[in-house]
């Protein structure tokens, strides 16, 4: 076990007591940079309503222990969500937890929550349902930013790629490639909110699978995602 850095947003004394808290699962790379301030404000606002909120850095990312290229990244990121849930319950006294995930963070949250009995709800913003498609997307975005290859003085180790601020070893890419949320066999939470991108078809297959597994699913399109 390695320490993770987290930010616990406690509810003010005058807020009504709640039994549910929020864990925020941020995206990665450039997407994490773009969403950081909004997620911090959301955590603060949620805590102000009486729901303690926890933000954290996954294992090997940000200020948490470990490195980008450590082995077993996919499993470690999912374990990080579990640790965050446990820490929020321990630190705040809540009994139930809601997860809010953005992009790949939503994917990790969904997989980490499956099989737990203390995740009351899952909210996904533009979730990555197919890992292979997401890898293609971030490679294309890297190319459009004029950074298809790093300069020679910053050459990457063999088998390592860098896309929009995210370093991935071959093992991590292979793990992400196998991700298909539409094939999950356990529901992550009794209630799921899915906010799809407005520039892509809705994630109908995944939502149908969630309903088949017994989850109540509320699905909407999030306007202005690309902007």
Task: Briefly describe each language-model feature range.
Residues 1-13:
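A short loop-to-beta-strand scaffold at the N-terminal edge of the catalytic core in hydrolase folds
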Residues 91-103:
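Alpha/beta-hydrolase fold nucleophile elbow
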Residues 38, 69-91:
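Alpha/beta-hydrolase active-site loop
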Residues 51, 56-61, 127, 222-224:
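Active-site loop/turn elements of alpha/beta-hydrolase fold enzymes
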Residues 100-110, 126:
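Gly/Ala-rich beta-loop-alpha elbow adjacent to hydrolase catalytic centers
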């Amino acid at each position: 076990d390695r320490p993770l850095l987290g930010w616990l947003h406690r509810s003010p004394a005058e807020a009504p007591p709640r039994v549910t808290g929020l864990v925020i699962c941020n995206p990665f790379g450039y997407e994490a940079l773009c969403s950081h301030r909004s997620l911090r404000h959301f955590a603060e606002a949620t805590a102000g309503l009486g729901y303690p909120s926890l933000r954290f850095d996954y294992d090997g990312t940000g200020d948490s222990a470990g490195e980008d290229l450590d082995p077993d990244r996919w499993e470690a990121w999912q374990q990080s969500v579990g640790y965050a849930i446990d820490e929020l319950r321990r630190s705040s006294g809540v009994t139930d937890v809601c997860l809010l995930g953005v992009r790949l963070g939503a994917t990790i949250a969904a997989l980490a929550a499956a099989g737990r009995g203390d995740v009351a709800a899952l909210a996904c913003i533009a979730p990555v349902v197919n890992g292979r498609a997401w890898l293609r997307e971030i490679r294309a975005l890297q190319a459009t930013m004029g950074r298809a290859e790093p300069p020679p003085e910053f050459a990457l180790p063999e088998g390592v790629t860098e896309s929009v601020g995210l370093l991935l070893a071959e093992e991590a890419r292979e793990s992400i490639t196998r991700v298909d949320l539409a094939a999950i066999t356990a529901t992550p939470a009794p209630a799921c909110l899915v906010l799809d991108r407005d520039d892509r078809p809705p994630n109908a297959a995944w939502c149908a699978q969630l309903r088949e597994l017994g989850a109540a699913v509320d699905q909407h399109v999030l306007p202005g995602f690309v902007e």
